[in-house]
């Protein structure tokens, strides 16, 4: 809030561009280029040619001294509900009329509003939660989540989550994402 107030003293709202740090990554930005600068994809990017979509955010590190944070957040809130949902929206959205931030935002909101809502019995069929255990990463030993600093020894906080979602629109009807 303080940063917003400081920025608004110098710039008007239309001159301020807020972006999630994850969305600023080159790979994420390239999704829009891949989708909309290559017209060949438009006729193929739909339920008639795509059986399913998988979006991964893989990491080779653990929580890296963020035990207190992760114990209250977990992977679902840390990664899925913001970063990965935005990626899903970029992958599934319709072509924006322009690449203006407001227009892209409006198209991503349409996707998110089209996500099929789960009923209670849908959750066990469509959600997997897990934790990483001790092992190796890049040839080096790593501890499991329960052995990380500031993590409760009986914690059930997820460090891995997988969701199967559906977007109820003409393009993605019946395609699991």
Describe the function of each predicted region:
Residues 2-177:
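Secretory/organelle targeting and membrane-embedding segments
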